[in-house]
């Protein structure tokens, strides 16, 4: 149930409305609040969400441009070199196929098209396909393009920016201290370095987390603080969908109420930022999915990289039934 609460949600709301950082203890109080406090917490988070984003919901669609064949040993990922999960494997798709995916994103009313590729870092040949596709998409469609291709250096970041990539995603994934328990083939610092290159290039930085990989509540709060310090414009909050054949296959799902508390925490700590309910939304939040949008203002529609999402029409209905509106892409 959680511990009894003496915290004033009004006080925390006032801080967030002024974009003032809450304390570590206030963050812990949110996560450890009695479950009966849930609606009060979500109401407080909604006040902040509405102040900065009204009732708009941003829709994003993922396109898996390269699947499998990844040399990294991330414990959560079915595309990892250490995974035995039966995932589809293919090299970088061509420009025509990537562009066709963008047309599907438009049909789903997405404003952002997210081109994702497995691997440690993109090769120059892979960048050729992606940048050519991005140029065609941005010249012919009312879409913003986000790319998630792995580690970047200055030259590769510059190429993506010049091609028209609006935003680049590179998640911190977990707490700095927990990172070695999740992967050892790259460091937490490697991820921060890529985000620095993204900012320097002029692309909008997108970075988030995966909840449910064995982190503590204090680490979750500190992860929210880390994202505030990074100043990511968009924060995807994933909830682990444990996949058979990966090292984390036996991790329990995050309880829906805990997931909602995490989303509220992210809103309070990063009040002016896009908070996106991302991978594992359907699997972990289940019937409480609609409540997530009282804290978050963004979702993915359709499938994820190697797991299924729900029907796009279902997401549209959730937004409509809440009295919210789909945000149109503003180019």
Swiss-Prot record:
What GO annotations for molecular function exist for this entry? 2 iron, 2 sulfur cluster binding; 4 iron, 4 sulfur cluster binding; biotin synthase activity; iron ion binding
EC numbers for this chain: 2.8.1.6
Annotated Gene3D superfamilies: Aldolase class I
**Metal-binding: present as a keyword of the record?**
yes
Concerning its family, UniProt says: Belongs to the radical SAM superfamily. Biotin synthase family.
Described function: Catalyzes the conversion of dethiobiotin (DTB) to biotin by the insertion of a sulfur atom into dethiobiotin via a radical-based mechanism.
| Protein name as it appears in the record | Biotin synthase
Q: Which organism is it from?
A: Bacillus pumilus (strain SAFR-032)
